[in-house]
Amino acid sequence: MEPWVPQWPPPSRGRPRSPVPDSERGLQRDGYHRPAPHSWHNGERLPQWQDVQGSPQPQQDPRAGPQRPQHVPRLGAWQQHAPAVDYYEGGHRGQLYSRPSYESLYPALTEDYAYGSHYYHGHPQWQQEGRVPRQGSPYVWHDSYRDQRHLSEHRPENQSRTFRRDSETQFQRSNRRNPHKDGPASSSGQERPGELFAEGRLSWGLTSQPSLGSKSNLLQQREVGLSSSSYELSQYMVDAPELYDPAAAAGWRPVPAEDIPVAGPKAPKKFYIPHVSVGFGPRGQLVCVSPSSPMDGQTALVEVHSMEVILNDLEEQEEMRSFPGPLIREDVHKVDVMTFCQQKAAQSRKSGTPGGRDSALLWQLLVLLCRQNGSMAGSDIAELLLQDCKKLEKYKKQPPVANLINLADEDWPVLSSGPRNLLTGETPPSVETPAQVVGKFTQLLYYGRKKEALEWAMKNHLWGHALFLSSKMEPRTYKWVMSGFTSTLALNDPLQTLFQLLSGRIPQAATCCGDTQWGDWRPHLAVILSNQAGDPELRRRVIVSMGDTLASKGLVEAAHFCYLMAQVPFGHYTVNADRLALLGSSHSQEFPRFASAEAIQRTEVLEYCRTLGGRPGLIASFQVYKLLYASRLADYGLASQAFHYCEAIGTAVLSQAESSHPVLLVELIKLAERLKLADPLVLERRGGDEAWEPDWLQRLRRHQELQQKAAADAGEPHSANLDTPGATGTTESTFYQDLPAYQRFSDAPGCEPAPWPTPTQTGCPSPFPSQPGPAAGPAGAPVPLYSVPETHFPVSTEEPQAVGGQVWEDTRQTHSAPGENIASPETFQEPEGLEVISTPQELLAPRAQSFSESCPGSVKEADEESSDEAGRKSARSPAHTGKLADATASAKRSGFGWFSWFRSKPTENAPHSGDEDSSDSPDSEQENPRAPSPREAGLGLSPPPLLESPPLPGASAFGGGTGRGEAQGAMSSQETAAGTGTGGLSGPESASSELYSNPSVLLPPPSVKGAVPLYNPSQVPQLPTAAGLSRPNRLAQRRYPTQPC
């Protein structure tokens, strides 16, 4: 940027000067102004631009105001630079003209500035002189002179003047810099002729800056209301020093953002004036740091004050200092405690509050307990209750509401003696002496009239004679006389309460005490406590009921007195069912009012009195309130006493380690850690970097560690329970890892490969894999522990599966959940000569639990086992046997296996029979199916599917095969044994059955091709074909009954 670009002096807003002579005006060349000599300012000739193309009706340039390029002077500085006034002196006085060669060269940042309902466009001489606007420049407008002229002709002059002043005010802030320096035209060399000025104009602009102390023009216009937009005023109005700050003005120039320094966010100051910093020390101290400036070399002044001295005048601190706590039997004498309680009782009497008398009674009870080392007798308590009763009230009998005998509103008749007058029917009044009354009672007894004698004695109030006589009669009569006697007493009479209690009833005073009409409750409690005869539990319930009644009337201290007499245990604040939490305080109110200092002190005195008798009287739920009291002591500056409380609480927690709460332990250690420096013993023994701790605090830390370890150990059973399924999951994962190897052999004839089955999945079950090969392996080959099938015989899907799965079924029924219906719709039967294997075999010989044609000895054993069921079961008809076999085959074809009991209908492939449902009826449980022959049993040795459903072997039913099952019955037992391994179930499948029954058993590895199978003698049929066809296996029928679907 060239340094010779001039700056235009600020225009004057004062009164317009007189017209300048024509000789002093500059020449006119092509519509451009030339500088003409003007007045001197500071010894320098200043040129002034004038318009020599003045028209008869001069037009105002509405954009001229915004194009003022330099400083915005203040109102007080307009008259200081009169020689630099650049008003147009020709034409109308005071009307401004634009200078198109300089001011209109670069328009304002906003091209069409709206004011009111009109828009003011650019200067008309741009298009008239043929200047080509720059492409993409924001400083170019495309308005013609015709539009500008049309707009100017229809605008009043006064409005143009007002807008010029407003627009100059609003945009001088943004355009006070030199447009030749900031605009893009100066760098591209596109300045027009006549735009070169002397350098003296720049120096004049620097010397003509107004005073900083004057008020901003924007502020003045805002005050007088000349601003057209308050929003624009807020955008451009700044303080006076910022108006002439080049750094602040640089923020408004249209330059790239990277050239503008961006101020980072600054956090506001927390304090704007110097202040005192305050903190609390560990020994109940208040530490104050006075304000200072360390950068100026000032030393900070630290003041240490004692909170105990500052808060010495508070009533709460005085109350805490007067209490001799912590109350430890070895450290505090009971005389001091009794003195404190007596003072509190006297204060409660003088208070005059409604509960003051009951509060004083509680403090007196604590004095009595402290005097008697925590023990109390009924007579002592009765004496305490009757101390405040100066004179006993005279209890008057109220008018009877109803007779207790016949519930009639009648009273005893008037006493009279003498015969009734037969004429008038009246009885003459007669006054009889007590001797005459007793004589009449005796005369009636002479003649054996006991009932009349009782009535006479009751009418004449001879209750002693009546009670004695009725006691020797029947019990009903005695109760009648007793009721008559008690009805003569007042309801609020303590004698009435005692007699009702001795009669085995809850006195009416227990539910009515506390009313103003009833009277004082103390004599009733005194008579109950003094007379211990009767049922102790009834007496306790009466006292508790009386306390509940008093508590419902708002008499908390009186209710708690009754609870102490009934030995009600202390509870917790959050449990509404607990009657006692703090002595003399109801836990139905807010906690600050509930946990008052007086209530805590009262309860601590009670705890101290209980420990005086040598008995463990610590209240476990009260220790947290003692900790709260200790923290309050620390707040009031009594740090040493608070630390002693921590020691007492720690001792109590260690003595009740089983019932201590972990949160209480943590908070106690935390508070003791803060207050341990308040103990002089700790300060004396403190040495080195490590602070010495008392023994009880160290024991608390060890107890906390033990609690944390115990909590971690308590979580181990849960983790052990989680590990147990983990072990099972390991076994199952091994099983699932071998699953793809088994699925390779699912391409057997008539079967479809399928993933792990779901209860709704249908299809043919995949038989166990069999590897074709020689019957025996090579010589010297190791014999595996698991039997390996060498030959796989194609088995139809309609064949029944091996009966050896009954052991699986037995295991499934054993491990099933209670109430779960696990029974299969098939009835599992075995031939008579087959041996039932009820326990899984060893892992070393994991043969399948299938049927075997055993020797006659085993047949006898089976007969002996099933002989006890002979009279309970009836033989099934052969017709039902065939139907059962059809249903079994249909269940096998359904592909559900173990899940077949979920289905109520067979699949589409199953043969439909009208009598098919009869096998599932309850009547079918008494019928036995036809046992198959060994030839048919050999066909039943086909391996059950493993991959379709894990419990499929348990769902195998032994029944007569039909159709293709009989057509393939020519297979010998040796071929069957060689083809199916051991019992029709290979080693892995038998192991999987054990896995189901015993999850801890690991799954055996896959079978090895060419291995020699183990010999199982039980698979060799030794039973004739006709054996077992007539008698069912009743033991199997008993174990596996048929359940309806």
Curated annotation (Swiss-Prot):
Residues 267-711 are annotated as: Central conserved domain (CCD). Residues 22-33, 149-168 have a biased composition (Basic and acidic residues). Residues 50-60, 989-998 have a biased composition (Polar residues). InterPro entries: Sec16_CCD, Sec16_Sec23-bd. GO terms for biological process: endoplasmic reticulum to Golgi vesicle-mediated transport; Golgi organization; peroxisome organization; protein localization to endoplasmic reticulum exit site; protein transport. CDD domains: ACE1-Sec16-like (cd09233). Transmembrane segments: none annotated. Keywords: Endoplasmic reticulum, ER-Golgi transport, Golgi apparatus, Membrane, Peroxisome biogenesis, Phosphoprotein, Protein transport, Transport. It is found in: Endoplasmic reticulum membrane; Golgi apparatus membrane. GO terms for cellular component: endoplasmic reticulum exit site; endoplasmic reticulum membrane; ER to Golgi transport vesicle membrane; Golgi membrane. The keyword Endoplasmic reticulum applies. Residues 1-13, 942-953 have a biased composition (Pro residues). Residues 957-966 have a biased composition (Gly residues). The modification Phosphoserine is found at residues 55, 137, 186, 852, 858, 866-867. Disulfide bonds: none annotated. Signal peptide: none annotated. Residues 773-784 have a biased composition (Low complexity). Residues 916-926 have a biased composition (Acidic residues). The keyword Endoplasmic reticulum applies. Liver. Residues 1-78, 149-193, 707-733, 748-789, 813-1045 are annotated as: Disordered. It is a peripheral membrane protein. SEC16A and SEC16B are each present in multiple copies in a heteromeric complex. Interacts with TFG. Interacts with SEC13. Belongs to the SEC16 family. Plays a role in the organization of the endoplasmic reticulum exit sites (ERES), also known as transitional endoplasmic reticulum (tER). Required for secretory cargo traffic from the endoplasmic reticulum to the Golgi apparatus. Involved in peroxisome biogenesis. Regulates the transport of peroxisomal biogenesis factors PEX3 and PEX16 from the ER to peroxisomes. This is Protein transport protein Sec16B. The gene is SEC16B.
